[in-house]
């Protein structure tokens, strides 16, 4: 805790060499090199009208390379009935392992953006409007393929399939919700949901997708686009 109820948090960790089977989804275990992680976070007094946070962190990937994360957030409370949270995280991934089926893993370098916000407005006693939004955009470049050996062990490289496995990925979800508290444990909800998953494999010579275009493609043609009305009613005393 710093003066003025500000906070500074530091962390450091070490991982020994070990076997791992999470990324392979149970299709064999492979050796992960020794590595570690560190993080630093600075946050201002959350009780004030404006509060901020800034964070940095790094983690070593399973077979080499460091991935770095940068995040920032702001919380605004202009008056008691309204609160707004805005957050942005960027990750620069180097050596990211992605499951490719059977006992195969792909190694990728990737840039990842994750903006989000959450807005709450208590319009009147018993009436609340909430809007939250989350998006993740990933642009990944393939750096090699590996296979888990029979009987587990160290990953072995696979040749002959490089150059056509880059991909873009976008995940979007947003919800606007109105809640009317009619009585204790009796509520009426009106909810709008919109969500989409965009995934595109890139071939040789395909242009790199701009982050704005990736967001637009994630927003267009949603797989979820619905209004829901719900009444929760309490029977009895």
Model-predicted regions and their roles:
Residues 1-237:
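Exposed, low-structure sequence patches enriched in small/polar residues
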């Amino acid at each position: 805790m710093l003066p003025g109820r500000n906070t500074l948090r530091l962390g450091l960790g070490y991982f020994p060499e070990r076997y791992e089977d999470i990324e392979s989804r149970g299709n064999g275990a492979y050796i992960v090199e020794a590595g570690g992680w560190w993080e630093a976070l600075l946050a201002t007094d959350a009780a004030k009208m404006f509060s901020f946070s800034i964070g940095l962190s790094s983690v070593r990937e399973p077979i080499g390379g460091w991935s770095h994360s940068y995040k920032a957030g702001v919380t605004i409370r202009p008056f008691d009935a309204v609160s707004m949270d805005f957050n942005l995280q960027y990750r620069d991934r180097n050596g990211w392992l992605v499951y490719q089926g059977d006992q195969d893993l792909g190694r990728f370098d990737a840039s990842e953006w994750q903006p989000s916000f959450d807005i709450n407005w208590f319009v009147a006693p018993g009436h609340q409007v909430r809007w939250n939004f989350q998006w993740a955009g990933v642009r990944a470049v393939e750096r090699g393929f590996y296979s888990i050996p029979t009987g587990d062990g160290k990953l072995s490289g696979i040749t002959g399939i490089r150059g056509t496995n880059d991909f873009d990925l976008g995940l979007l979800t947003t919800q606007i919700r109105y809640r009317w508290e009619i009585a204790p444990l009796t509520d009426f909800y009106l909810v709008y949901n919109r969500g989409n998953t965009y995934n595109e494999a890139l071939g040789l010579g395909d242009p790199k997708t701009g982050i704005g275009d990736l967001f637009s493609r994630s927003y267009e043609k949603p797989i979820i686009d619905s209004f829901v009305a719900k009444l929760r009613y309490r029977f009895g005393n």
